[in-house]
């Protein structure tokens, strides 16, 4: 897998985990405590659309993990891990932008998220050193 494809896998992981967070937040604001779900389902009082979103969010978490594992095969952990921070910025921005979350932008949160994004850019915009041919042959022998 190429570095570019691994970065795309990491970004797919970020998008999926962000969607899962937003889905969980939306669902859980419409559902009772999970320990009450079975009791409420018996009385047909459970919001099934919200429960479906919980299930979809759990699936998104699982897919996110799969993409994350693929990304980690190639990306250095120091760079890959910083990409996860983009999720904080994405969730904050979407939660404050989409009206059904009833979240607001604040100066302190926006400054904090801006610092996170600046940190991710600082870490990831530096070019990675190219591995030498000796490093590549050693790496290939390791997998034989």
Swiss-Prot record:
Record topology, Cytoplasmic segments: 1-6, 78-80, 126-144
One biological process term in Gene Ontology: lipopolysaccharide biosynthetic process
Single GO term (MF): carbohydrate derivative transmembrane transporter activity
Domain of life per record: Bacteria
Topology term for the membrane: Multi-pass membrane protein
GO cellular component, one term: plasma membrane
UniProt keywords, alphabetically: Cell inner membrane, Cell membrane, Lipid A biosynthesis, Lipid biosynthesis, Lipid metabolism, Lipopolysaccharide biosynthesis, Membrane, Transmembrane, Transmembrane helix, Transport
Disulfide links within the chain: none
Transmembrane segments: 7-24, 57-77, 81-101, 105-125
Coiled coil: none
Metabolic or biological pathway, per its Swiss-Prot or TrEMBL entry: Bacterial outer membrane biogenesis; lipopolysaccharide biosynthesis
Compartments (UniProt record): Cell inner membrane
Residue intervals annotated with topology Periplasmic: 25-56, 102-104
InterPro entries according to UniProt: Flippase_ArnF (IPR022832), Small_drug/metabolite_transptr (IPR000390)
Protein family per UniProt: Belongs to the ArnF family.
Role this protein plays: Translocates 4-amino-4-deoxy-L-arabinose-phosphoundecaprenol (alpha-L-Ara4N-phosphoundecaprenol) from the cytoplasmic to the periplasmic side of the inner membrane.
NCBIfam families, alphabetized: PRK02971.1-2 (NF002816)
Subunit structure: Heterodimer of ArnE and ArnF.
Name of the molecule in the record: Probable 4-amino-4-deoxy-L-arabinose-phosphoundecaprenol flippase subunit ArnF
């Amino acid at each position: 897998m190429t570095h570019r494809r691994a970065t795309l896998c990491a970004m797919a992981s970020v998008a999926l985990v962000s969607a899962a967070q937003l889905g969980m937040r939306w669902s859980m604001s419409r559902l009772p405590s999970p320990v009450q779900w079975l009791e409420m389902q018996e009385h047909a009082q459970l919001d099934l659309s919200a429960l479906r979103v919980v299930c979809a969010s759990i699936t998104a978490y699982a897919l996110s993990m799969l993409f994350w594992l693929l990304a980690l095969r190639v990306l250095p952990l120091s760079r890959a891990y910083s990409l996860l921070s983009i999720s904080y910025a994405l969730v904050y921005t979407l939660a404050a932008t989409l009206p059904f979350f009833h979240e607001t932008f604040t100066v302190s949160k926006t400054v904090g998220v801006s610092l996170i994004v600046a940190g991710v850019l600082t870490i990831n915009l530096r070019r990675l050193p190219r591995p030498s041919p000796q490093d590549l042959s050693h790496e290939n022998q390791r997998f034989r």
